[in-house]
Amino acid sequence: MNILLSSTLFVLLMFQIIGSGMGCDMKVRGLDANMKKMILDLHNKKRQIVANGQQSGQPLAANMKELHWDDEIEAIAQRSAETCVFKHTAKSLRKSSKYSYLGENVYKGGYPDPIPRSVNKWYDEVKDVTPAVVKSFSDDGPMIGHYTQMVWANTEALGCGLVTASDGTSYLFCQYGPGGNYPGQQIYKQGPPGSGCKNGKSSKYPGLCN
């Protein structure tokens, strides 16, 4: 075996080791059906609250889509969670067969109940979002990117991965397709809920779009 081939195999092996979460003693790995449903429902309910003008200080949303669960994105997010490192996944690794770029929210905290804690923590950034930022996103100023990715109107797919280490620390990675948070773009179109839907309105979450 030549040196180049040996080096290539070594790099691939190290990538697999890092991606598998070795070095983190995992007590909980992955999400069951109830957990997935909870995460998805929490996201859609938060989006619905904003779209319908029930969030103080936030304008109505005309074109906010209902999110659906994406198994491929879940697998990508799970690999990231299994690194047990509290930092964003490299953008070059955040893509799926359908979406060229996936947004990402990351949470590190105690167990139990990392799901509602994480989603509520991300959403709490709404207090620093102004109507001007909704019209033209900017990441200058207070941290708002977790919230804005949660309610980015064109995002339609969600997948998350979870690891809880033996010390009780949970790592939750949620990825979103297509990703949002593009400077200068609108987070969502302002207007009566559902008035900007291109493929009809959601029957499960009134105010959101299919």
UniProtKB/Swiss-Prot annotation:
Tell me where it resides. Answer: Secreted
Tissue expression as described in the entry: Expressed by the venom gland.
Sorted alphabetically, the keyword list is: Disulfide bond, Secreted, Signal
Pfam families tied to this protein: CAP (PF00188)
Instruction: Quote the protein name from its UniProt record.
Output: Scoloptoxin SSD552
Post-translational modifications: Contains 3 disulfide bonds.
Q: Known PANTHER family for this protein?
A: CYSTEINE-RICH SECRETORY PROTEIN-RELATED (PTHR10334)
Q: Source organism lineage?
A: Eukaryota, Metazoa, Ecdysozoa, Arthropoda, Myriapoda
- Gene3D superfamilies to which the protein is assigned, alphabetical: CAP (3.40.33.10)
